[in-house]
Regions:
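C-terminal segment of N-terminal export signals and the immediately downstream linker at the start
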Residues: 1, 23-46
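N-terminal export signals
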Residues: 6-28
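Short, glycine-/small- and polar/acidic-enriched structural segments
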Residues: 37-172, 182-183, 199-202, 227
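Solvent-exposed, polar/charged alpha-helical surfaces in well-ordered, non-transmembrane soluble domains
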Residues: 67, 89, 93, 107, ...
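Pocket-lining segment of extracytoplasmic ligand-binding domains
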Residues: 104, 187-275
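Short helix-loop capping/hinge motifs at secondary-structure junctions, enriched
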Residues: 138-146, 175, 238-247
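Secondary-structure end/capping motifs
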Residues: 243-320
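Conserved C-terminal helix/tail region of periplasmic/extracytoplasmic solute-binding proteins
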Residues: 311-345
Length: 345
């Protein structure tokens, strides 16, 4: 419970003064080891507890992990969370072992003292970011993003939207202090936005596509070109150190699933319609903006990109302390042993 409160406090203290001074001495330096003493094939658990977000998870829907792990006598359990920050809270509370989030939630979790490690990243393309938007109702008097100063903007603090808004504001010479942040999970904000009770909303698919089909959204800008390093699979540190063989299987299956999905987009759409109860037209809109570019290993280049994100949160006063991404990594030789060579770029 202590870790969960810390995480919530960090996410709540987004602008201005901080009430988190008590945290600064309590976050342990978890330190990346220079060389591995771990067996890269080790698997100690009989149950893998996976976290996923309510927006949907193809990894869960296709059950590729279950098929791979059943011969090894390992079960897979899935727990749903509203968004990335809530998933990170669940991991800190010991409810899950591994989960998928954007670039921002693990940074807030790190500040709060969570003992986590980065497992694998996500490849980006030139069009990645089309599904994440800053939007207004059609009748809004705001005509362009450059008019955003002073506006109330609704999004989930500590989510990927937090980095999106920082970079978007930076691109037009503004800072986080030039807007009024209102934190609300996307699923809750959608209803209020569709009813015209939210002036500016940051969202993504499928919520964006649902509002788009209803004719109730006008996009001010998307996140294309704002240099996010992309999302990650994150694991509890103790679990990762004791089960690197399981992480190896997870990475292999994820990478293979991305290749399958890009080659079978119609089947992915059918799964989406079935699992998320989406209208076919909404699913078409989601798929038109979605890419399956594959996974990206924890290379020095990716680590540097994630460090840049963490530094921006500190430099803009969103988090109260500077963090080092390298403190939340496994040893380099262990990554090399569990990650396909082709994705270590």
């Amino acid at each position: 419970m202590i870790k969960r409160r810390r995480f919530l406090n960090v996410a709540a203290s987004s602008v201005g003064g901080f009430s988190l001074a008590h945290l600064l001495g309590s976050c342990s330096n978890q330190g990346q080891q220079s060389s591995s003493t771990f067996d890269p094939n080790a698997i100690k658990v009989k149950v893998l507890r996976m976290g996923y977000q309510s927006a949907g998870d193809l990894f869960r829907n296709r059950q590729v992990l279950e098929k791979r792990l059943e011969p090894l006598g390992i079960k897979v359990e899935w727990a749903q969370f509203v968004q990335g920050p809530q998933l990170m809270e669940g991991m800190a509370a010991g409810k899950i072992d591994v989960g998928s989030v954007g670039e921002t939630p693990p940074i807030f979790a790190q500040v709060a003292g969570s003992k986590l490690v980065y497992v694998v990243g996500t490849q980006r393309t030139a069009t990645t970011g089309r599904s994440s938007v800053i939007a207004v109702p059609p009748e809004s008097t705001l005509r362009k993003f450059e008019e955003i100063k002073g506006q109330e903007i609704y999004f989930q603090k500590g989510s990927a939207s937090h980095y999106f808004i920082l970079r978007a504001l930076q691109s037009i010479g503004l800072t986080i202090k030039d807007i009024k942040i209102r934190s609300m999970p996307t699923i809750e904000a959608r209803g209020a936005f569709l009813e015209g009770r939210i002036p500016v909303w940051m969202t993504g698919d499928p919520h964006y596509a649902i509002a788009e089909k209803m004719g109730r959204i006008r996009v001010l800008r998307d996140s294309v070109g704002l240099d996010s390093p992309g999302g990650y699979y994150i694991a509890d540190r103790k679990f990762a150190e004791e089960n690197p063989g399981l992480l190896k299987i997870l990475i292999e299956e994820l990478h293979g699933l991305d290749k399958w999905a890009e080659a079978h987009r119609d089947e992915v759409k059918k799964l989406m319609i079935s699992e998320q109860k989406l209208d076919p037209d909404v699913a078409d809109r989601v798929m038109s903006r979605r890419t399956f570019a594959g996974r990206r290993g924890l290379s020095p280049a990716l680590i540097a990109e994630q460090q840049r994100v963490a530094d921006l949160f500190f430099e803009t006063g969103v988090i109260p302390k500077k963090i080092d991404i390298k403190d939340f990594l496994l040893p380099p030789d262990l990554y090399a042993a569990i990650t396909p060579t082709e994705i270590m770029v």
